[in-house]
């Protein structure tokens, strides 16, 4: 069981997860990465160390171009064929975008 003393402030979690405080608030608002505890009086968010894995997955999915709704769905499907299929589809999309960009570059050269 995680105790209150084990939880990290949003700033600490931001540093460790490499997600900005602004994005952590955004992900909380969209239900993607909800803090382990929110103080009822101050509204301060606290995160559990185990949530760093979710944060890493969110960062990686965002970095490959997926949006909040896709990230939310994929986190729920982690470890399933849906996860693998979605990443394969995103890979194909990125390859197509790269091909199109190369064609546009050839018009300049």
Segments predicted by a language model, with ranges:
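Basic helix-turn-helix/winged-helix DNA-binding cores
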Residues: 1-68
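Short, charged amphipathic alpha-helical surface segments
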Residues: 59, 71, 77-109
């Amino acid at each position: 069981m995680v105790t209150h003393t084990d939880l990290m402030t949003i700033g600490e979690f931001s540093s460790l997860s490499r997600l900005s405080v602004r994005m952590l608030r955004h992900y909380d608002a969209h239900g993607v990465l909800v803090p382990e505890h929110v103080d009822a009086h101050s509204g301060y968010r606290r995160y559990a160390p185990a949530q760093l894995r979710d944060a890493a997955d969110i960062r990686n999915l965002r970095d490959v171009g997926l949006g909040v709704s896709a990230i939310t769905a994929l986190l729920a499907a982690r470890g399933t064929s849906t996860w693998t299929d979605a990443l394969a589809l995103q890979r194909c999309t990125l390859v197509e975008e790269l091909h199109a960009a190369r064609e546009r570059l050839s018009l300049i050269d």
